[in-house]
Amino acid sequence: MKVLQFNQDATCCVVAASSHQISIFNCDPFGKCFEIDTKNSKKKTSNNNGSASNSESRNNEESILITNGSRDRTDAEEEEDNEDNALVTGNILKEGEFVIEMLFSTSLIAIADRGQGLNKGKKLKIVNTKRKCTICEIVFPHEIVDVVMNRKRMCVLLESDQIFIYDISCMKPLETIDLWEDHYKRSQANSFSNASNTGTLEGDSANLNRVATNLLANATQKSVNGSNPSVRTRRNSLRSKIRPRMVLSNDDRSILCFTAYSSPKKNKPNSEALYDVVIYDTLNVTPVNYLNSVHKGNVACLAVSHDGKLLATASDKGTIIRVFHTGVDSDYMSSRSLFKEFRRGTRLCNLYQLAFDKSMTMIGCVGDTDTIHLFKLDDASNSLPGDNSSNGHWNEEEYILASNSNPSMGTPKEIPLSKPRIANYFSKKIKSSIPNQNLSRNFAYITVNESNRSCLGFPDEFPNQVYIASDDGTFSIYSIPSKPGECVLTKNNKFT
C-alpha cells in the first residue's frame, strides 16, 4: 500500500493501493465510500496573475490557488528541478507516494502527491469528496512531508523543517515555525551566553544585550536571504532517519506537539539530534511548554491525546514508550511532567505509530515487528513518578531524565554531613524522582504478519474494539480482553 491510515476518530480508513488511486473506506459498516484517480483527474491551470481555473467551474465550483513564498521560476531553475525530479523519483521516492489527511468523517481531505516530482510534491490540494472537486490548492516553497488537521487548524510540515499553521475555516496562514532556524538561534544564544559567562565578551550589561540582539537579528536575516547554508539549505526530511515529527490534538483546543532540535553537546558542537518536544497552542498561536530530552535517542514517534493533555513518545530504539503531561492544565508541575513509562520489549524496533483512545485509558503501539502492543494507562501496577513505593534499579538514561526535570535534586546545606543521613536523603530523593525500572509490559497484544505494515485505530463508538489495517489489504476488528492477554479477532474484511 502507498498509503494506509485511519482518520482522527477511526470512522474511515484511507487506502492507496496503486500509484495514482486513492480510496476511502467506512469502517462500520465496512465499505468503499470514495475513490479518486489522480492520474486521470482533470488538471487545474493557472494564468500568469496567479488566479486559477478548474474544469469543475462548469458546475459553479470555486477553486483557489494559494502560494506561500513561491514566485515565477526561471528556465534554469526548472531545468535543475527536472534533474532533481529524476534523481528523487528514481532512487528515493516511489511513484505515487502520497501525503493524505482526512478531516474526521467529513467530505474534506488534504492530498499531496510526492511521487510526481518535486514541484507536485510542493502542492497541497483540499478536495471535497462529495462534490468531487478541488476546493483550493496551496503551493509551498518546499516539498510537503506531513499534514495534520482538526476542525480549527491545519498544520503542514515541509522538508525544509518548517511548519505552516492555517485557520482551516478560511485557509488563512497564521504562523510559520522554522525548526532549524530556531535551533540555530538557540545555539548562537547559548554560545553568546557561555562567552559572556567566561569573560570572553567585555562591557556592561546593556552592551552585551545589544550584541546578543544583533547576533540573533543577523541570524534571522541570513536565513531569510538564504545566505546562511546551515539554516536554509538543509533538506533531510525525506532522506534521513533524523526527521521532525508533529501531531495535533483532535479537539478544538488544537494543541500541536512537534520535535525540536536539541542544543549541540559540548563534545559534539555540530551534532543534530531530535531529543526535545515543543508543546504549541495553535488556537492562540503561542508556545505552551518545552519538554527537554524526553529520550536518550532521537524521538521517532509521537501521539497526543484527544484533549491535548497527554503526549506519548518513543525513540528510534523503540524499546521504551513514555507518556508526558503536556502542560496545558493549570495545575501542571514541570518537575512531574513524566506520567507513565512502558517497556515494549528488549529488541530494537522501528516504531511508526502511537495512538491514544479517546478516553485516554489505553495507548497502542505499532512497529516493524510481529506484535502490536496495547498498554493500559490506568493500570495501578505501573507506579507513577514520585511514588515512594518504587524500589527497582535505575539506569543512567532515567536518572538523567529525572535530574533534568527536577533541578531540586541535590544535598541541602542544612543536612549534617553524616553518612547515614546523606544516604537516607539521597535514597528518598531518588525514589521520589525517578521512575521504576521494572516497567509495565503490554496489557493486550495482537499478532500480525511481520512482513506487512499495519496501522491501528481506536473507534470512538466502540471503546472495547481496535481496528487494524494491513498492507496485504485486510481490515480486521479485534475485541480488547477484560484481562491481560491476546485480543480476539471478531471480523475480517478486504480492501477491494
UniProtKB/Swiss-Prot annotation:
Upper lineage: Eukaryota, Fungi, Dikarya, Ascomycota, Saccharomycotina
GO MF assignments: phosphatidylinositol-3,5-bisphosphate binding; phosphatidylinositol-3-phosphate binding; phosphatidylinositol-4-phosphate binding; protein-macromolecule adaptor activity
Pfam families tied to this protein: PROPPIN
Coiled coil: none
Entry-annotated residues carrying Phosphothreonine: 213
Primary location class: cytoplasm
Protein name per UniProt: Autophagy-related protein 21
More details: Present with 6020 molecules/cell in log phase SD medium.
InterPro entries: PROPPIN, WD40/YVTN_repeat-like_dom_sf, WD40_repeat_dom_sf, WD40_rpt
Domain free text: Contains a beta-propeller domain involved in specific binding to phosphatidylinositol 3,5-bisphosphate (PIP2).
Family: Belongs to the WD repeat PROPPIN family.
Positions of the UniProt region annotated as Disordered: 41-86
Phosphoserine PTM sites in chain numbering: 237
GO cellular component: cytosol; endosome; fungal-type vacuole membrane; phagophore assembly site; phagophore assembly site membrane
Biased composition, class Low complexity, residue ranges: 46-57
